[in-house]
Amino acid sequence: RSSATPRDSIDYPVFDGSVQYKTPRAFTLPTNPGVYLIHDFRGILYIGEAKNIRNRFLQHHRNEENTLLKELVKYPFGDLRFYWLNAETKLKAVKIQKYWIRVFQPITNNIKYNKDRS
């Protein structure tokens, strides 16, 4: 049995924070690497990773290339939130992102990972 606590395990996400998905909230976001997700009452809409969480949040607002995500955040169901988990390195963030996409299968992630391809 693993001695990892839920905080150390990617199986049990414990987020470092969340904000409403609005640009004025950007100043509260960290500038370090991490994994993030965008969520409303439908569930997890998108999972991403970033070397700078704050900059990536702002990029989603300025120039969203994912047309489905763009449409869903324009017309959210209930409270639209941005959650993040700090990661020590970008490599760790990528690993967590791939795993979460496989497990949670968000509807707007274009890349889907399975056990054979990581």
What label would you give each PLM region?
Residues 105-118:
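Coupling/hinge elements of helicase-like and P-loop NTPase modules
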Residues 53-99:
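Conserved short loop/helix modules at catalytic or binding sites
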Residues 1-51, 55, 91-96:
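GIY-YIG nuclease catalytic motif and its immediate N-terminal context
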Residues 59, 101-108:
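Short arginine-rich
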